[in-house]
């Protein structure tokens, strides 16, 4: 049995920042994540994706963001339990006991759920024989964008991933077709502005009012993508690569059975300290829902800070927290509060 102050479920960017925030408050952390490495979707799905809304970084790729967050958390010696899921929760007096899928047992006073989308997988378009092209011509995630240099690429979708990747790949691709069923994109307004500016050149062509209809190729190598509009008019796009970005399937797994208020794959929390309906359990980042929620990494960072400041009195048995700015703290100090 491991004893600690805080268990953080999820080692994505918000979970890693929660480690830092806990450490600054003198709390020891154990972190559980289902992936083999820390970083969550930023590493597993899109390590080379540029992120534009992190303060002080005009642009930072996801992999570098995770590297910096891990370095920031490192002085507080978090214990990572990777490649395993939190499957059982038992409450005993003022403590929680968590059991993982590898039978790891951890006892803590506070739980921070920063599990993002939970277990995730891509929403695939319903195209005949799409599996024949997957991993060679059809990709749902981008781990190495250099493989797309000089290619003719069809990107399908209208959200942040579709728009951001169209912009990012336009520097190296021969041609990009961005297919969306509407003329209006749901990505960040500045990203949409950049997209439309690039589309004035021949690097990106916006195919709006159309949806994917069929794939054509041989031996797993794509030759063209057929798209169709609402009037059933079709158009053939010469392409080597298809990148469908239609979001992720979400599965909370065992978390859904913990007695938390769950709605549409999200955990309901209060909007002040992001505590769930179970005292001592908080949810932050994309998995948390409250009125006015913004699904941004920086929002998750703020939620991490607020939730852990609120959890302080629980960890330290009612002791009041005297707020300090980070410039007055020793970031190398170690926690002395670990649960006995």
Swiss-Prot record:
Cofactor: record remark:
Binds 1 FAD per subunit.
**Where along this sequence does the record place binding of FAD?**
33, 41, 46, 86, 120, 286, 327
- Entries under InterPro entries matching the protein: FAD/NAD-bd_sf, FAD/NAD-binding_dom, Fd--NADP_Rdtase_type_2, Ferredoxin-NADP_redctase_2
Reactions catalysed, semicolon-separated, are:
2 reduced [2Fe-2S]-[ferredoxin] + NADP(+) + H(+) = 2 oxidized [2Fe-2S]-[ferredoxin] + NADPH
- Write one Gene Ontology MF term: flavin adenine dinucleotide binding
The keyword Flavoprotein is assigned to this record = yes
Q: Does the keyword NADP apply?
A: yes
- Hey, what's the signal peptide range on this chain? none
Q: Which UniProt keywords apply?
A: FAD, Flavoprotein, NADP, Oxidoreductase
The catalytic activity of this protein is classed by the Enzyme Commission as 1.18.1.2
Gene3D superfamilies membership: FAD/NAD(P)-binding domain
Q: From which domain of life does this come?
A: Bacteria
As cofactor, the record names: FAD
**Which top class of enzyme applies to this chain?**
oxidoreductase
Q: How does it assemble?
A: Homodimer.
HAMAP family attached to this UniProt entry: FENR2
- What family classification does the UniProt entry report for this protein? Belongs to the ferredoxin--NADP reductase type 2 family.
| Protein name (Swiss-Prot/TrEMBL) | Ferredoxin--NADP reductase
Q: Which organism is it from?
A: Rickettsia rickettsii (strain Sheila Smith)
């Amino acid at each position: 049995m491991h004893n600690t102050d805080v268990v953080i479920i999820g080692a994505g960017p918000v979970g890693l920042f929660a480690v830092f925030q806990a450490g600054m408050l003198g709390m020891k952390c154990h972190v559980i994540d289902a992936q083999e490495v820390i970083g969550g979707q930023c590493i597993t799905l899109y390590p080379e994706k540029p992120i534009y809304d992190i303060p002080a970084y005009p642009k930072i790729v996801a992999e570098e963001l995770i590297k910096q967050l891990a370095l920031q958390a490192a002085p507080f010696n978090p214990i990572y339990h990777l490649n395993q899921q939190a499957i059982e929760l038992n409450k005993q007096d003022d403590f929680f006991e968590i059991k993982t899928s590898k039978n790891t047992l951890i006892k803590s006073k506070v739980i921070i759920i920063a599990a993002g989308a939970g277990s995730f997988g891509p929403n695939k378009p319903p195209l005949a024989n799409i599996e024949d092209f997957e991993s060679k011509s059809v990709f749902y995630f981008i781990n190495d964008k250099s493989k797309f240099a000089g290619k003719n690429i069809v990107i399908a979708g209208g959200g942040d991933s579709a728009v951001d990747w169209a912009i990012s790949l336009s520097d190296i691709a021969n041609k990009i077709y961005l297919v969306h069923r509407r003329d209006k994109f749901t990505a960040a307004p500045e990203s949409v502005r950049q997209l439309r500016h690039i589309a004035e050149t021949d690097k990106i062509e916006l195919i709006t009012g159309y949806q994917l209809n069929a794939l054509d190729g041989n031996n797993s190598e794509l030759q063209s993508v057929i798209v169709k509009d609402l009037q059933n008019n079709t158009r053939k796009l010469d392409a080597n690569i298809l990148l469908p970005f239609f979001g992720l399937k979400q599965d909370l797994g065992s978390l859904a059975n913990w007695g938390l208020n769950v709605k549409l794959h999200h955990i309901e929390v209060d909007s002040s300290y992001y505590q769930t309906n179970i005292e001592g359990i908080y949810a932050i980042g994309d998995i948390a829902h409250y009125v006015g929620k913004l699904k941004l990494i920086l929002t998750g960072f703020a939620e991490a800070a607020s939730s852990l400041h609120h959890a302080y009195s629980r960890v330290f048995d009612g002791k009041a927290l005297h707020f300090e700015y980070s410039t007055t703290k020793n970031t190398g100090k170690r926690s002395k509060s670990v649960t006995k």
